[in-house]
Design a protein with these regions (language model features):
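Short hydrophobic/aromatic-enriched beta-strand-loop microsegments
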Residues: 1-7
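C-terminal binding/interaction regions
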Residues: 8-65
């Protein structure tokens, strides 16, 4: 599950709620300083599970088709 983020909030919550495992950054959109903040936010958080797990299970079922 990849995510394309242009700010730290999205990076944090796509990790926490969507269990994203790949982070994509636009080279022309994100400068070096912001890129470091986004990467830190992505790496500093883990998947919360719980109510979000249902969505992940649905995605995994689609991947298996």
């Amino acid at each position: 599950r990849a995510c394309c983020c242009s700010e730290a909030f999205s990076a944090e919550y796509t990790r926490r709620h969507n269990n994203a495992n790949t982070l994509c950054l636009g080279g022309r959109v994100v400068g070096p300083g912001l890129a470091c903040q986004i990467v830190d936010a992505f790496l500093d958080h883990e998947f919360e599970g719980g109510r979000h797990q249902k969505r992940i299970d649905k995605m995994m079922a689609l991947e298996a088709l």
